[in-house]
């Protein structure tokens, strides 16, 4: 076992992975046979449950881990549903399940899903698309590398709340994936 200490590590991990909802055969996201996912350990660039599993894994061996919602994208919160006036979506051809993007008061990009709509109102869901889901990951650690102080600082200011860590966009991710398949609805 690797048994790395989260607080003392200044390394990036490189992994291949695929993820399914537990009990399903449908792959939600995968980078197998593509560019590895690289993330800086301890900077919330991926979900907590997967990071913990990576730190315990043997390099070069396929591992499997089931991650509860609390260690993934959180439990589904009905309070994250919001009804807004339809005119806020003027010029947009709405479809149930489509992803839309907006900005928070502090200018962070946020993804939401159109749950339902009428002629006057739209029901928007701000939960992550995988909130409330138990996820089954199959992954292989390809290796670790030392990271510079600049990379660590950049991860905290640019991509530290990315898709896998903070329910936002794909900031700071290398390889175009992060294990969450944010584009699905």
UniProtKB/Swiss-Prot annotation:
Reaction equation(s) it catalyzes: [protein]-peptidylproline (omega=180) = [protein]-peptidylproline (omega=0)
Stretches the record annotates as PPIase second part: 134-156
InterPro entries: PPIase_dom_sf (IPR046357), PPIase_FKBP_dom (IPR001179), SlpA/SlyD-like_ins_sf (IPR048261)
Annotated ranges, domain PPIase FKBP-type: 1-99
UniProt keywords, alphabetically: Chaperone, Cytoplasm, Isomerase, Metal-binding, Nickel, Rotamase
GO molecular function, one term: metal ion binding
Domain of life: Bacteria
IF-chaperone, as annotated region: 81-125
Renumbered residue ranges of the record's region PPIase first part: 1-74
Enzyme class per UniProt: isomerase
EC number: 5.2.1.8
Binding site for Ni(2+): 163-164, 178
Keyword Cytoplasm set for record: yes
CC per GO annotation: cytosol
KW Methyltransferase (keyword) present: no
GO biological process: protein refolding
Subcellular location: Cytoplasm
Record remark: domains: The N-terminal region consists of two globular folded domains that contain prolyl isomerase and chaperone activities.
Its job: Folding helper with both chaperone and peptidyl-prolyl cis-trans isomerase (PPIase) activities. Chaperone activity prevents aggregation of unfolded or partially folded proteins and promotes their correct folding. PPIases catalyze the cis-trans isomerization of Xaa-Pro bonds of peptides, which accelerates slow steps of protein folding and thus shortens the lifetime of intermediates. Both strategies lower the concentration of intermediates and increase the productivity and yield of the folding reaction. Also involved in hydrogenase metallocenter assembly, probably by participating in the nickel insertion step. This function in hydrogenase biosynthesis requires chaperone activity and the presence of the metal-binding domain, but not PPIase activity.
Protein family (similarity comment): Belongs to the FKBP-type PPIase family.
Annotated protein name in UniProt: FKBP-type peptidyl-prolyl cis-trans isomerase SlyD
Organism: Helicobacter pylori (strain ATCC 700392 / 26695)
Encoding gene per record: slyD
């Amino acid at each position: 076992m690797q048994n790395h200490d989260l607080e003392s590590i200044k390394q990036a991990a490189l992994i291949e992975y695929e993820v399914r909802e537990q009990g399903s055969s449908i792959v939600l996201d995968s980078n197998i046979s593509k560019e590895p996912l690289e993330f800086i350990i301890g900077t919330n660039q991926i979900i907590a449950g997967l990071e913990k599993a990576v730190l315990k894994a043997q390099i070069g061996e396929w591992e499997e881990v089931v991650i509860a919602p609390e260690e993934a994208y959180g439990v589904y919160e009905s309070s994250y549903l919001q009804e807004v006036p339809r005119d806020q979506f003027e010029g947009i051809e709405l479809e149930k399940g489509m992803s839309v993007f907006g900005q928070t008061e502090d200018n962070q990009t946020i993804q939401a899903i159109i749950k339902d709509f009428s002629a006057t109102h739209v029901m928007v869901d701000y939960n992550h698309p995988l909130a409330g889901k138990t996820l089954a990951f199959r992954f292989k650690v390809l290796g670790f590398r030392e990271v510079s102080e600049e990379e660590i600082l950049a991860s905290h200011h640019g991509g530290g709340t990315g898709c896998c860590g903070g329910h936002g966009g794909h900031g700071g991710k290398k390889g175009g994936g992060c294990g969450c398949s944010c584009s699905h609805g």
